[in-house]
Regions:
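Surface-exposed extracellular loop regions of Gram-negative outer-membrane beta-barrel proteins
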Residues: 1, 13, 28, 36, ...
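Short loop/turn motifs that connect adjacent beta-strands in outer-membrane beta-barrel proteins
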Residues: 26, 68-74, 116-121, 175-176, ...
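Outer-membrane beta-barrel signature, preferentially recognizing the C-terminal barrel domain
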Residues: 47-70, 192, 206, 212, ...
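Transmembrane beta-strands of outer-membrane beta-barrel pores
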Residues: 1-3, 24-26, 35-39, 70, ...
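C-terminal beta-signal and adjacent terminal beta-strands/loops
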Residues: 272-274, 278, 374-381, 389, ...
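Outer-membrane beta-barrel transmembrane domain signature of Gram-negative proteins
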Residues: 98-180, 345-347, 359, 371-373, ...
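Flexible loop and strand-edge segments within Gram-negative outer membrane beta-barrel domains
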Residues: 2-13, 27-106
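Gram-negative outer-membrane beta-barrel transporters
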Residues: 173, 177-178, 269-271, 293-382, ...
Length: 444
């Protein structure tokens, strides 16, 4: 709740989805369309000067996909369109003129192909993607503003960019050895530069029937979001001259895979360039804004390990304990925040994370899921003008469900121990909360 006692983490949502398909002798076609509405109190997530923020989002999405059924050659085209409408209220219900309205449209075309020969599998294709935004706050001034439906306000800012990419990949599969190598060439109208190339290699070797080792090297690019480029309001100051993030990722690991036990251990090293972040200098006072910046270089080393026990494989489908899994992850970055500098993303991360989960069959279709999580986050947050370090915390969740063929009834409780903790920024996370519901699957 906010300081006035009103709700500031409430939410209401509705969704609708349709999917159809056609199966022919030469081609299969799938299509879908959906809509979702969500209204939610966003607490102090976007800024600390208001604890009564609110957001309304509406999303439309549709796509058509096809695949030919040739013996050696397959063609997989798809076309999609997504629209998102957003109204953000920094001060909930204080008037339309203070709100931030935005509408994004993403239109894309994928042309994927692959050919299978005695030399392996060769995949190639292209993607064309256009994304645009019109807004009251984000983007460059528009020559022709667009009316916002339902209110006497115009979208008077916007930005549009198109991405083109072409990819080529070849995979060789031998009895115990697999090698895949490829490259992506990409060009975006936003940065005005030519095509850039991003290679990748994946290799694996079967040591024994149940043991496999693997290694990979991949490169990637991420463009700054519209928010990172233009969000300048309520304690935030964006930089529209941000550069795109670039990443080189190395990973190696070993897997043990059987029907009853699955275990994996991996080590990775990421070399990041121009990593995008929001930072704030607390030494300059509470009015100092968050600023979007590029970190010139940021290297990350990590370890992940997990094991899953499927007890149904050993004692049958009616086992009381159906399965149990536990995982651990560790991350270390070679750049730390400077004194009084608070980071939202790049320099704020989970140093340690432990997750344990089990699924129990209580009776017939009555099941219980229990989940335990322990996290230790690196970074700082500000509260009441003070800089605080994150503290480790433990969470326990449970979900009880009756799982029938066409319907499901459930009740779940999160943060059963009612822990007080901060997981991002200076926003206190909810204590214990319970919800119940039902789902039903219609067959047409």
């Amino acid at each position: 709740r906010n300081k006035a006692g009103g709700l500031n983490a409430d939410f209401k949502q509705s969704k609708g989805f349709y999917q159809g398909n056609y199966r022919g002798d030469q081609v299969d076609v799938k299509w879908y369309a959906g809509i979702s509405n969500k209204d939610f109190g966003s607490n102090t997530f976007y800024g600390v000067s208001s604890d009564d923020q609110f957001e309304h989002t509406r999303k439309f999405y549709t796509a058509v996909q096809a695949e030919t059924k040739g013996q050696n050659y397959h063609f997989k085209p798809s076309v999609y369109w997504n629209r998102g409408e957003d109204r953000f209220e920094y001060f909930r219900g204080k008037g339309e003129n203070t709100y931030n309205y935005g509408r994004t449209d993403v239109l894309g075309l994928n042309l994927n192909n692959y050919v299978e020969t005695v030399l392996g599998k060769t995949a190639f294709g292209a993607e064309f993607r256009n994304e645009g935004i019109i807004s009251t706050k984000l983007g460059e001034p528009l020559d022709n503003p667009t009316k916002i439906h339902g209110v006497d306000i115009d979208y008077d800012k916007g930005l549009n960019r198109t991405n083109m990419s072409f990819h080529l990949e070849h995979t060789v599969i031998l009895p115990r050895f697999t090698l895949s190598a490829g490259v992506i060439a990409t060009k975006n109208t936003w940065d005005g530069e030519g095509f850039k190339f991003y290679p990748g290699v994946d290799v694996s070797y079967q040591l024994a029937r149940d043991w496999k080792i693997y290694a990979s090297y991949n490169t990637s690019l991420r463009l700054p979001s519209f928010t990172e480029l233009y969000y300048t309001m309520q304690g935030y100051k964006a930089d529209k001259h941000l550069k795109a993030e670039k990443m080189q990722a190395f990973e190696g690991g070993i897997k043990y895979l059987t029907p009853g036990v699955k275990a994996t251990v991996s080590v990775y090293r990421n070399h990041g360039t121009n990593m995008i972040d929001w930072i704030r200098d607390t030494s300059k006072g509470e009015d100092e804004p968050w600023q979007s910046v590029n970190h010139t270089k940021l290297n990350t080393t990590g370890v992940e390990a997990s094991v899953l026990f499927n007890f149904r494989h050993f004692v049958g489908q009616n086992a009381f304990v159906k399965d149990f899994n536990v995982s651990y992850s560790y991350i270390d970055k070679d750049k730390e925040s400077e004194p009084n500098i608070v980071s939202q993303y790049a320099l704020e991360y989970l140093k340690h994370k432990v997750v344990a989960q089990t699924n129990l069959r209580l009776y017939s279709k009555l099941n219980l899921n229990i989940s335990y999580r322990w996290q230790d986050r690196i970074g700082n947050y500000t509260t009441d003008g003070k800089t605080m370090s994150y503290k480790p915390y433990t969470l326990l969740d449970a979900r009880l469900s009756w799982d029938a063929k066409q319907y499901r009834l459930f009740a779940e409780a999160n943060n059963i121990l009612n822990k007080t903790y901060y997981d991002h920024g200076n926003v206190p996370q909810p204590g214990i909360w319970v919800r119940a519901g039902a789902t039903y699957r219609f067959n047409f």
